């Protein structure tokens, strides 16, 4: 087949642009007629952020939130918020927790749905942190999003070797009076175990016990492996080396987002391979 000439290519380009505009109009009308939410803007994100304790989720999530003007839904925070607001779901969750039970998947999914519908920050998309933890939860999340004519774009896992993670976490030191923090390896004090400013003794954080952390990591990997497998099959999983400096991790995240943007190219780019 002969290559398409420049004139013919431009004509095709113009025609496809008109078709894409028309398709967008029809999609908007169908969504409105069905009473569903309007399609999200192209510059939005719907993602899950996974990673073991200390991998850097707390550092990267605010950056993602700022870039996309989206909401960050950490399940623990969300649960406490719903309980504090005394919403129907919050009251139901509190009753279960007061009895020592575990909050059901249905309640958590309901809380996520309530945030997506009522939280104005979620118009730019969302970052889910701490959910799903099982394949069943992942399937129920997909079903809820499908009801909203949405689907996840990314499942990003911040990956780091357990031994490095243990040294990163257990090496943390703090000056109790001021809150100044140090690290035995990455940011050591000038004098061993002494605060640089006052010379007072530093202490290890009580929640940074190596044995306790190792147990948490065993649980994390056992829970996460099947969920990672689920999202690998759907094609939205990405793994990022979290042992890098935070700036390098952020650059890797931007690469994931740019790759998705390229994958969602125009009809013309899919036909011709040109953007």
Swiss-Prot record:
Its main location: cytoplasm. One of its GO terms (cellular component) is cytosol. ATP binds at residues 54-59, 172, 181-182, 244. AMP binds at residues 75, 80, 101-103, 130-133, 137, 205, 216. PROSITE patterns: ADENYLATE_KINASE. CDD domains: ADK. Residues 74-103 are annotated as: NMP. GO terms for molecular function: adenylate kinase activity; AMP binding; ATP binding; DNA replication origin binding. It comes from the Eukaryota. One of its GO terms (biological process) is DNA replication initiation. InterPro entries: Adenyl_kin_sub, Adenylat/UMP-CMP_kin, Adenylat_kinase_CS, Adenylate_kinase_lid-dom, AK2, P-loop_NTPase. It catalyses: AMP + ATP = 2 ADP. It is found in: Cytoplasm, Cytosol; Mitochondrion intermembrane space. Residues 171-208 are annotated as: LID. SUPFAM superfamilies: P-loop containing nucleoside triphosphate hydrolases (SSF52540). Its EC number is 2.7.4.3. It holds the Pfam family ADK. Keywords: ATP-binding, Cytoplasm, Kinase, Mitochondrion, Nucleotide-binding, Transferase. The keyword Metal-binding does not apply. PANTHER family: NUCLEOTIDE KINASE. Belongs to the adenylate kinase family. AK2 subfamily. Consists of three domains, a large central CORE domain and two small peripheral domains, NMPbind and LID, which undergo movements during catalysis. The LID domain closes over the site of phosphoryl transfer upon ATP binding. Assembling and dissambling the active center during each catalytic cycle provides an effective means to prevent ATP hydrolysis. Catalyzes the reversible transfer of the terminal phosphate group between ATP and AMP. Plays an important role in cellular energy homeostasis and in adenine nucleotide metabolism. Adenylate kinase activity is critical for regulation of the phosphate utilization and the AMP de novo biosynthesis pathways. Monomer. This is Adenylate kinase. It comes from Botryotinia fuckeliana (strain B05.10).
């Amino acid at each position: 087949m002969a290559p398409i000439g420049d004139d013919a290519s431009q004509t095709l380009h113009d025609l496809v642009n008109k078709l894409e505009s028309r398709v967008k109009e029809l999609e908007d009308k169908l969504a409105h007629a069905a009473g569903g939410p309007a399609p999200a803007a192209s510059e939005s994100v719907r993602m899950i952020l996974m990673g073991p304790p200390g991998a850097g989720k707390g550092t990267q999530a605010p950056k993602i939130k700022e870039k996309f003007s989206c909401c960050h839904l950490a399940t623990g925070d969300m649960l406490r918020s719903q309980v504090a607001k005394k919403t129907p779901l919050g009251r139901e969750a509190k009753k279960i927790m007061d009895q020592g039970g575990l909050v059901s998947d249905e309640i958590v999914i309901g809380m996520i749905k309530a945030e997506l519908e009522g939280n104005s920050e979620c118009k730019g998309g969302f970052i889910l942190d701490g959910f799903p933890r099982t394949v069943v939860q992942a399937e129920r999340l997909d079903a809820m999003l499908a009801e909203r004519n949405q689907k996840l774009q990314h499942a990003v896992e911040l990956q780091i070797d357990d031994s490095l993670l243990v040294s990163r976490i257990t090496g943390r030191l703090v000056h109790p009076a001021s809150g100044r923090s140090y690290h035995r390896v990455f940011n050591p004090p000038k004098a061993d175990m002494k605060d640089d400013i006052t010379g007072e003794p530093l202490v290890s954080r009580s929640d940074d016990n190596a044995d306790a952390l190792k147990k948490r990591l065993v649980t994390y990997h056992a829970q996460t492996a099947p969920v990672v497998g689920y999202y690998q099959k759907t094609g939205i999983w990405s793994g990022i080396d979290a042992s890098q400096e935070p700036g390098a991790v952020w650059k890797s995240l931007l690469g994931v987002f740019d790759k998705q943007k390229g994958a969602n190219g125009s009809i013309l780019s899919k036909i011709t391979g040109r953007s």
